[in-house]
């Protein structure tokens, strides 16, 4: 597809890299010649220096005939205007990044009235991701599939886990184990697969069955009632608002006095402390060792790493760190900090998923596609037509390909987590997992 990206910052470059590597014809627009030169040296893309709200520049970039224009400059207003102009020129789809909290309540109106395909807010997306992780303290990651209707929870088995040494068919649970990561490899397991301590497994089921599974297998995380947030930026604001609305105790540490005053005004139910959250003495004075969770959200990766390691050392139940450089992920993992969030990656992945769905929905029934397990597994949702070869046949009688799993069936708005006796019917939407070595297409049974 022909894609134009306006803005070559962290997020713009990430999108350019992913989309060009997937074979799309990408043109990047930015006013900074030095940044564009770097991108042009690294990636096989067209680079155009200029202003994204210039009709002449947009036309030169091919916005009039592109399949998608993505505006991710540092200014919300520029992104919105850029998409409006691109639509007028003839761009089929447009996506704008809008980050200002003042626009948050107007996002739906902006998207609908201006004819945008999608609006993204990396800070809000990151806050939502953190909030989900705090709901399930044992989870390292939570993926939402099938347009948010199916949850995939990822967690690590300890060496003494009651699941270690057990084959999946021996698990007396309605939870479906979808993927297992072990020693750098990712597997879609069958019933004979034996779990080991240290495995990172992803499961899906109804919330009730997941809770029961965690209880019976001893995977119990302390319910989080209090959260300490270090840093008072946009993510902290969105997260604190979500937590306060859920009735949790929230304490925010921020060193900028004006920002503290603003947060106190916007978040009356949160306790806002004016102080340096990287000061370990202050952290202890504010009862770090008594809080259920700490989230490090300063503007500096190094501070977030140190704060998170300090909290882990003091056995805080759940520790989450924001990092912009994913190379720090391994360092934190070795230090016992399992959970990290990278805002620009979260939103970039949403856009990449949108692009993949655009590309793969052209005539083959695929409605959405998400990559899991470090990109080794694809989750595909497809609509079942009457001509589908496996209609009305129980899953246990199907000769499914190895490395292929039917994770859920959506029928009449209801999610079914299938057993062997369930069958696929015409009109269903089916969520399947397939190893990336297999070609991306609607399910073939054998």
Over which residues does each language-model region extend?
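Cytosolic regulatory regions of ion transport systems
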Residues: 1-437
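Single conserved hydrophobic/aromatic residue that forms the stacking wall/gate
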Residues: 435-446
